[in-house]
Amino acid sequence: MDGIKKKMIAMKLEKENAMERAVQYEELLKKKEEEREKRENEISELNTKMKQAQIDCDEVQETLQEQMNKLEETEKRATNAEAQVAAMTRRIRLLEEDLEVSSSRLTETLTKLEEASKTAEESERGRKDLEIRSIADDERLNQLEDQQKEAKYIAEDADRKYDEAARKLAIAEVDFERAEARLEAAESKIVELEEELRVVGNNMKALEISEQESAQREESYEETIRDLTERLKAAEQRATEAERQVSKLQNEVDHLEDDLLAEKERYKALSGELDQTFAELTGY
């Protein structure tokens, strides 16, 4: 009986232990179930993430391809840009060389300008004139243009007058040569007439000896003498007229030469003034 009780107590204890283990197992099973559900949820989330990752990977691949294409285009543009840079470098080198030449010229110009400035500073009156001309430079330039036009007109008119004077001088030289020829002819004729008069005088002396015998011849000789005298007077008048004409032409030529010289001096002075004015304006 005691054995049965002990056995019953042992079985009861074992039952209680079994119940406790069952409860523990149920709790453990519940935990395992929860862990399983959690794992399944994690797996589902992982699957979702993997799908999204695949989508993202595809998008990344597409983006990568686009970036590769853009990279190729960029490399092409970079190659072209490098070629342009090389061309620009060569151009810059040429420009630098031109700049060196220009700088050298600029230095020379600045040196000349400095010398001109020093020269301008030496003259207070010139400086004031430059200041006045710089204030009214437009009006001065217009005046200079008018003066230049006037100088050009004067020069052209002087050239025309010179040509006209040269033409008149040539005509005068021809007339002078003709007058000299006529004068020489007149002088020769006068010599001939004097010789004839001398001969006539001798003849008159002979006629005086034989006046009665040569009365008619004397009248003829007197007529000849009168004719020769008139011819001599005419020759003298022509010679006088030729000398007067030559003197008149010479005076006219001298007058034209004086006018031409005056015009040239005026043109020279005006050109000098223009050159000086432009030089002062440039130096200023």
Curated annotation (Swiss-Prot):
InterPro entries in alphabetical order: Tropomyosin
Segments for region (Disordered): 111-131
Origin: domain of life: Eukaryota
One Pfam family per UniProt: Tropomyosin
Coiled coil: 1-284
Keywords: Coiled coil, Repeat
UniProt key word Oxidoreductase: no
Disulfide linkage: none
Protein family membership: Belongs to the tropomyosin family.
Function according to Swiss-Prot or TrEMBL: Tropomyosin, in association with the troponin complex, plays a central role in the calcium dependent regulation of muscle contraction.
PANTHER family for this protein: TROPOMYOSIN (PTHR19269)
Domain writeup: The molecule is in a coiled coil structure that is formed by 2 polypeptide chains. The sequence exhibits a prominent seven-residues periodicity.
Assembly with partners or alone: Homodimer.
Protein's UniProt name: Tropomyosin
Organism, scientific name: Schistosoma japonicum
